């Protein structure tokens, strides 16, 4: 059952000398209880779009439905009630620095109309949920970035929302802390059944927790679907660029001059398939030599996407047949230009790309 539906949503900003269309005709359906990701490069319109869900940005055109009800025109008490049902976690934490951690939680409880007698117990409960109940009397300035974000998550959950919006909630954190925050959000999703909408430019985040994903570029959704399907077989150039930047592997430049003769090929496979038997079969069948120069595997949920760079050599006819066979059995095949292999991978394009 869908909990969020955006129907042909546009957001236009009118500046003094020009008009900016930040979101252009976006339609999305987000199911109850899922973690839905919106990814894209900076300036794609992700933050503006996610803010239409709780009307921090009101659509210029189109409709926003929550639990099947059109909330686009909500104002006053109706809008305040709506926003209590939708928590928001910001990149910059947005904690109040001159009050304690506990008081930051109480601030949200008070705004949500919770009875004063319940404030302390609810604050303790929320801080226990995020593993920070011992910090209830501490001030935000004494906390690490990860701890501040945990407090921000606890505060966003203060009024038992059905939906949690996360705007680049991990982009200011280091890798280890990011993984801890993602694990916390996944646990909250599972244990509390909260629907999470998470925007990011980091595919490392997307691969760990998103059930479904939409890719944005220039205010438009250019591709969407199950996370593994979108990133294992990208169709739009923006999605392909995101994937290539993330999955790209480079041959160390110092090795390039010493590479023997042959054709250098990048192969990618997905799912449960593996390239090792294929490479052995091709070597045996066609009498060519195949040397693995580099390889990596990334998991999107439980499913792998693997990349290998191999050097293949042999008689011309056998080599052509071997390359055709490899091409037919992988989802991505690219011959690399030896003269460009010293370039950084996926900077201005793929390393060694023709």
Feature names for model-found ranges:
Residues 224-225, 233:
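ABC ATPase "signature
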Residues 54:
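Helix-to-loop junction immediately C-terminal to a conserved catalytic motif
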